[in-house]
Every structure is written in C-alpha cells, then in structure tokens.
C-alpha cells in the first residue's frame, strides 16, 4: 500500500457561481452546491498511474447507476496537468447475483484493500471523472468550517491528508483491458501495463 498527497491550487480566474445566491431555501441543496462550488474553484496537482485503485463516493445515481462508496481503478496514467482520469468501478462479488460475463469481469481479490472480497470490474460503467473526486471527501472534511466568503479570500494551495491507494496486479489489469476490447468490439489493441 502506498500513500499519495494531493495538492489543490486555487484557479487563476475563479468561477462565477449562481449556486451561492442563497435563493434556494433548502439547506441540503445549498450545502451541496457550496461543496460543488468549492471543488470547482480548485484544480488538483497529482499524477495518477494506471492500474491504481482508489475509493471514491459516487453522487446520486438513477436506476442501476452506481451510488455510494466504491473502489475504482484508473485506466490510464493521468499527468499532473490533466484534471481528468478515466476509471472503471469495482464491486464485490455477490453469490446470489447473476452477472453479464461481457460487462462484469471477475478479477479476484485486490491485495491491500481492507476486508477485501472477490471483486468484479464493471466495464459497462466506465467513466471519466475530475481528480478532485478521488480526494473530495477529504477536501470537504478539511474545510468543513470554511464559509463561502472565505473561499474567495483564500489564496495559494492546501494539502489534504494522505490517501491510501492500491494497485491491481498486471494480470488483473490485463483482464480488464481484454474485457474492454470485447465489450466495445474493438479487437486487440497494443498496450503496455505501466
């Protein structure tokens, strides 16, 4: 298990927000918008290597979309200057559930993850996310006392506590890449692991 530190830097040109006009009387929506606006005003400075596994929180989902906390695997190396990373969610195997063998791929146990079970990669739920989602809960916890007016006054950068990250084995990552090839019907693609 390794640790990474995230450096978040205030954007040079702050975003203009209609979120913070206090017209919305619902405190939950208001707090959610405040958190979203806070994240949007920072860019992350961290390199993510492919096959790295993180735990993130998916926001509200519709129907069968994922929601809540899940482990995800980064599908490509994302340089410090790139704000996005493409991920595939992982889920634990449920004995009673029948899986689509083309879109839900068995990858076994991911070493290092606490209370780990046999895992599957949900290839049909591949998505691209902003890197702040990898560290977002910790960012919010770090600044829970900060009010919106103070956010605008804040200058410079902040460090967020270390975050545990894990890695898939080369074999596990190859299984996922093969599954993507088959799922998208693109055939074999020349690729390298690290």
Region roles according to the model:
Residues 58-59:
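Short, surface-exposed secondary-structure boundary micro-motifs
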Residues 64-112:
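Compact nucleic-acid interaction/catalytic patches
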Residues 1-33, 98-194:
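C-terminal terminal-subdomain/extension
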Residues 50-53:
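Loop/turn positions that initiate beta-strands
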């Amino acid at each position: 298990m390794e640790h990474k530190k995230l450096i978040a830097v205030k954007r040079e040109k702050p975003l203009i927000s209609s979120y913070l006009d206090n017209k919305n009387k619902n405190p939950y929506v208001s707090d959610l918008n405040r958190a979203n606006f806070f994240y949007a005003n920072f860019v992350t400075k961290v390199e993510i290597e492919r096959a790295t596994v993180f735990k993130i929180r998916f926001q509200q989902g519709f129907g069968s979309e994922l929601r809540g906390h899940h482990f995800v695997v980064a599908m490509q190396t994302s340089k410090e200057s790139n704000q996005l990373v493409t991920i595939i969610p992982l889920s634990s195997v449920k004995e009673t559930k029948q899986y689509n063998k083309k879109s839900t791929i068995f990858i076994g146990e991911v070493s290092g993850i606490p209370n780990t079970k046999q895992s599957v990669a949900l290839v049909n739920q591949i998505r691209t996310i902003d890197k702040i989602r990898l560290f977002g809960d910790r960012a919010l916890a770090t600044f829970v006392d900060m009010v919106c007016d103070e956010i605008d006054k804040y200058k410079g950068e902040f460090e967020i506590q270390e975050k545990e990250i894990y890695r898939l084995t080369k074999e596990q990552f190859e299984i996922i890449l093969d599954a993507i090839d088959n799922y998208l019907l693109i055939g074999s693609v020349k690729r390298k692991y690290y």
